[in-house]
A protein has these predicted regions:
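Conserved alpha/beta core surface patches that mediate binding of polyanionic ligands
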Residues: 1-8, 32-45, 74-78, 133-136, ...
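C-terminal effector modules of nucleic-acid-centric enzymes and ribosome-associated factors
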Residues: 1-5, 20-23, 28, 36, ...
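Flexible, glycine/charged-enriched surface loops at secondary-structure junctions
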Residues: 1-9, 51-54, 90-91, 125-129, ...
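A glycine-rich phosphate-binding loop feature that marks nucleotide/adenosyl-phosphate handling sites
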Residues: 2-20, 56-63, 93-98, 128-141, ...
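Flexible hinge/switch segments at interdomain interfaces of large molecular machines
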Residues: 5-20, 52-55, 85-94, 211, ...
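Extended, well-folded interaction surfaces typified by the phenylalanyl-tRNA synthetase beta subunit core
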Residues: 19-23, 27-187, 337, 390-394, ...
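Short, structured patches in soluble enzyme cores that scaffold and shape functional sites
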Residues: 23, 62-64, 155-157, 194, ...
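A carboxyl-terminal module marker
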Residues: 45-48, 68, 72, 202-206, ...
């Protein structure tokens, strides 16, 4: 049996909310002057008690059950709702201000555009801790991320959180390993974040903070199969060329013209094979390649991992210098010429491309490498590059005499600077 009636244990009853409403504030927020009597009548009809009133405004007690009305703007909204939005006339003149998008806003906007593009290409975004293991920078002997430039935490929570990351590589690899261990082996990740550098040469007692800097980066990881096999086709493994295509799509998306970029061999020892995308002034925009066997063994990864590091700050600065112009499609035809060049094995295509653009700045539109041959029937220490050159004049049709003169000049410069020979 129930021995007693219901007892309400309520030691601290909810109190009504005190709100001060200023008439001038209400007029400014509504956009129209409403009489004080009208405001008071509406407030009392909404069960708000007027505690005190003066020429400037009223002090109200809002019922405790009205948890959505606790600020002056909430009271004004309730009053306007009863008064009627249709009773507030739209002024004939509206005041507005224009804001100019700054560099940080543009970088953030570009970041979002690229993130949407990567998600559309099958990537998943990851987020790792900016704090990292000190052993990553002491054990691997990294030529681009030496231990001396690591920002160390004075009182770390654990050995795994002892330094600020110099690169986003290790956090990403931890995510890759975690997923592989959970039987998810076909992965495409991207991450946006900052890296942190200490430069002891910039340190001074007057301004020690100058020794520390941070840079924005975007990292990309691809590993596993590109396409799962079925009865219709075999498995297709991911490759460095897939990542290269993704990176070049990113450059296009942010407005970086391909002819403003030079591709060079990367000496970063995190890669077994790698390349870097640089401006013609030598600023690194992207480094990408196949992760070294040493790193894969350290993380107990058996499959190839393809990694790209986009230097976001450098990329945004380079894009800012690009002058985008819109012109009509040329009425005059382009001309294509191919050269088979015999060069030393240590000569890179980027050197040929650079010399070509220096030789002919106006009419040379593109330089493309379409074949590389090393092997029999070539002198020792030599390789063959097959290169395509596109020439075009926007004002007239090029004749054979002009084309031959440009090609002779190109061959002469390639011969003198790279010791190149025609095959």
């Amino acid at each position: 049996k129930i021995s007693m009636q219901i007892k309400d244990v309520y030691p601290e009853p909810m109190q009504d909310f005190p709100v001060r409403l200023n008439y001038e504030y209400a007029h400014r927020l509504i956009g129209k002057e409403i009489g004080a009597e009208t405001i008071k009548n509406i407030a009392t009809s909404l069960e708000m008690k007027i505690v005190k009133e003066d020429a400037e405004g009223i002090d109200l007690l809002v019922p405790a059950y009205r948890v959505d009305v606790q600020r002056p703007c909430d009271v004004v909204e309730d009053i306007l709702r009863i008064y009627g939005y249709n009773n507030v006339e739209i002024p004939t003149q509206l005041k507005s201000s224009l804001t100019v998008q700054g560099d940080e806003d543009k970088a953030y906007h570009s970041q979002n555009l690229v993130a949407e593009q990567l998600v559309g290409e099958g990537f998943m975004e990851i987020l790792n801790n900016s704090l990292s293991k000190a052993s990553y920078y002491t054990d691997f002997d990294l030529n681009k991320y030496p231990n001396e430039t690591t920002v160390k935490v004075m009182n770390p929570l654990s050995a795994d959180l002892g330094v600020m990351r110099q690169t986003m590589l290790f956090g990403g690899l931890e995510s890759v390993v975690r997923n592989i261990n959970h039987k998810s082996q076909n992965l495409k990740f991207f991450e946006v974040g900052n890296t942190y550098i200490y430069n002891k040469e910039k340190w001074s007692e007057e301004s020690p903070i100058k020794a520390y800097s941070q840079e924005a980066h975007m990292s990309l990881f691809i590993t596993g199969k590109r396409v799962e096999g079925s009865w219709a086709h075999a498995d297709e493994q991911s490759s460095i060329y897939e990542l290269k295509a993704v990176v070049e799509n990113v450059l296009r998306r942010v407005g970086m013209p391909q002819n403003n970029v030079v591709i060079k061999h990367s000496d970063n020892n995190i890669f077994s094979k790698g390349v870097s995308y640089e401006t013609r002034a030598g600023k690194v925009l992207v480094e990408l390649g196949i992760l070294s066997l040493k790193l894969k063994k350290a993380f107990d990864i058996e499959q190839d991992v393809f990694y790209a590091d986009i230097h976001w700050d450098n990329l945004m600065k380079a894009v800012k210098k690009v002058n985008l112009t819109y012109t009509d499609i040329s009425k005059y035809p382009s001309v294509s010429r191919d050269l088979a060049l015999l060069v030393d094995k240590n000569v890179e295509f980027a050197q040929i491309e650079q010399i070509a653009h220096q030789t002919e700045k106006k009419l040379l539109k593109s330089v493309v490498l379409f074949d590389v041959y090393e092997g029999e029937h070539l002198p020792e220490g030599k390789k063959s590059y097959a290169v395509n050159f596109i020439l075009q004049d926007e004002e007239k049709t090029l004749n054979d005499k002009q084309i031959d003169a440009i090609m002779k000049k190109l061959i002469a410069n390639l011969t003198s600077k790279l010791n190149a020979e025609l095959r």
